[in-house]
Amino acid sequence: QGKKGLDVLHFSPEWSLQTRLRNDTGLGKYVTADLSAPEADIHLDITSMTLPDGSFDIVLCSHVLEHIPADRQAMKEIARVLRPGGVAYIQVPLNDALAETDEDPSVTDPHERERRFGQFDHVRMYGPDIEDRLRNTGFKVTAVRPASVVGEGEMARYGLWDDVIWRCQR
């Protein structure tokens, strides 16, 4: 018997990445999840997942948490569904100029949300303290800049942004 591939849970999957991962025969199980998108494999509330503990080796969560009022609960749930040693790759809008994350649940006006949080449906703009939030969930956290992995040429070629990706190991 060959070694089983890694099981991946992908929240609000980007079409191009989803297509590539679905065709990756080296993966074990690849599952897409979203609260309401009809094309998702499963419909999940990221703050209260109906999945067993330790179900996945990898969780991909790019530009999701800024939409979730209870982001810390979502982080706990991500940690819960990861197997020991599993890794979540989390990306959020980040403003390094902020002393701390800007969030205010009383802000419901779409124009004010766009002004403060960068988009009408965001509930916060993360500051550098996102790293502490992730660590306080129990993750071992490493900040990764894509340019440090693929280089500036590849970044330009594929039109990638150099936004921090948080590598969060359980």
Task: Describe the role of every protein-language-model region.
Residues 3-48:
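Class I SAM-dependent methyltransferase SAM/SAH-binding core
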Residues 35, 61, 93-95:
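An acidic- and aromatic-residue-enriched active-site/binding cleft used to recognize and process polar
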Residues 39, 50-53, 68-69:
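Activation segment
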Residues 46-59:
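A short acidic, Gly/Pro-enriched loop at the edge of an enzyme's catalytic core
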Residues 57-69:
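A short SAM/SAH-binding and catalytic strip from SAM-dependent methyltransferases
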Residues 69-78, 83, 87-170:
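S-adenosyl-L-methionine-dependent methyltransferase catalytic module, highlighting the catalytic core
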